[in-house]
C-alpha cells in the first residue's frame, strides 16, 4: 500500500476566501498524524481483521460539507477507520451551496471498505458523486464559465461547420454577384466543405477551365514579385510546393496533396471550410496545427482582386510559410493562447494575427520582406507595403492589437519584426496578460488539449520534458565523445 499523499495549497484556499483557511494549520497538523502512520496502521489492522488488501483498487468520491473548523478532519478520520488509503485531495467552494465546500478524494481500497466508508460519510456529509473520472472538476464543472473550445482534434468538425457567411452569400459589390453559374459553383464548394469530417481525405476537385485560367493569372503575376518581396522562408518552400504539390500556372493544387506535404514539413494540416469562421473558431484550429482553407477560386472577371479569401490566397499566401517549422509554431501559439480566453482577448489575438500572419513584415539582410499571406497573395498591396508610401511600425502586440483592420483597402499601417522568433517571444509575453484560470498544453501524441491547473496535470507535462531532455543530454554526450571533449 502506497503512503498517503495530501495536497493542501495555501494559495488555493486563500483564492477562495474560505474561513476554513484559518483552520488549515491545525487541521494540517492533525491530518499529518493521520497520514504519517497510515500505511503501517492499515497493514497491521488488515492483518488482524484478515482482510485481503490485494483486491484494493483506485476509486474516488466527492462529498460536500459545511465550511466550519474541524469538519474536514472529522470526515477524513472515517477514511482512516475504514483503512482507505488517500492518494490525493482537492477542495473548492460548492456550486450548490455557498456555505459549503466540496472535497474530492482520490483513494485506494477494497470494495467492502469503500462501501462501508460511504455509509458513514452519509451521516456527516452530502455525497455529490462516487467514482468520478480523474478529470471531473478540471474538464467539466471547472470549465462551466469558460467559453467552449475543442479538447481534441476531431472536435474541430464543430468549429468548421459554424460558418458565419457561406460562399454563396455574395455581397452586391462582389464580382460574381450577378453570375448565376459562379454562384452555383460556389454552392458546390460549400457542400464539399460542410460534408467533410476529421480523418477523411479531402475531396479532390476538378477545376474548370475558367478557374484554372484565373489561378494561372494570379500565380504568374505574383511569381514575378516573390524574389524581391517575399521572405527567405517563403522562397525556400515555394519550389518544394512546385515539386511535390503541383504548384504550376496551368494547375490548381489539391488540398489533400498540400495537407500531406505540410504534415511532413511542420506538422500542420489543412481542412476545407465553407466560408468565414469566427476568430475564436479559426484560431482554435491553429492550436491543433490545422488551417481552415477555402477551395473556391475568385471570379474570373477580375483575377487580381478578391473581397474574400479564396484558394489563391490560401495556397499562395499561407501554405508556403506554414511549411516552415518556426512559423508553424508561431501560428500554433496564437491559437493556443485563444483557447478559453474571453471575447475581448480573442479579438486582441485575432488582430495580432491579422497584422502578422496576414500582413506582417520582417527584416532580412537589411531589407523589408513580406511574410503575411494577405500581402503575398495581393500584387497591389505587396508592392505598396514595401514602398516608401507605406507606414511601417515595430510590432508590439500591446499596441498592434488596437490597430484597425481594413478589409477592402490597403492597411493604414504595417508591423515589422526582426524575425519570427522575435514575434513569437513577444506574443508569448502578451499571452501572459490574458485572463484565464488555467494554462493549456497540446499533446502531439493524442492530438488533444490538456488543461494545466493542478500538480497532477503539470506532472504529466514534466515527464514528457524529462524524456526530451534525456534525449538531448544523450546526444550531447555522444557528440562530446566523438569530438574527444
Curated annotation (Swiss-Prot):
Enzyme class: oxidoreductase
Cofactor requirements of the protein: Fe(2+)
A molecular-function term among this protein's GO annotations: tryptophan 5-monooxygenase activity
Binding site for Fe cation: 313, 318, 358
Gene Ontology cellular-component terms listed: neuron projection
EC number, as in UniProt: 1.14.16.4
Residue span of region Disordered: 32-57
Biased segments, Basic and acidic residues type: 43-55
Domain of life according to the entry: Eukaryota
Gene3D superfamilies in the record: Aromatic amino acid hydroxylase
Domain ACT, first and last residues per copy: 60-135
Pfam families assigned: ACT (PF01842), Biopterin_H (PF00351)
GO biological process terms on file: aromatic amino acid metabolic process; cellular response to lithium ion; circadian rhythm; response to activity; response to calcium ion; response to estrogen; response to glucocorticoid; response to nutrient levels
Keywords (A to Z) from UniProt: Iron, Metal-binding, Monooxygenase, Oxidoreductase, Phosphoprotein, Serotonin biosynthesis
PTM annotation (Phosphoserine): residues: 19
Reaction catalysis annotation: (6R)-L-erythro-5,6,7,8-tetrahydrobiopterin + L-tryptophan + O2 = 5-hydroxy-L-tryptophan + (4aS,6R)-4a-hydroxy-L-erythro-5,6,7,8-tetrahydrobiopterin
Listed pathway(s): Aromatic compound metabolism; serotonin biosynthesis; serotonin from L-tryptophan: step 1/2
InterPro entries: ACT-like_dom_sf, ACT_dom, ArAA_hydroxylase, ArAA_hydroxylase_Fe/CU_BS, ArAA_hydroxylase_sf, Aro-AA_hydroxylase_C_sf, Aromatic-AA_hydroxylase_C, Trp_5_mOase
NCBIfam families named in the record: Trp_5_monoox
Family: Belongs to the biopterin-dependent aromatic amino acid hydroxylase family.
Complex and partners: Interacts with DNAJC12.
Name of the molecule in the record: Tryptophan 5-hydroxylase 2
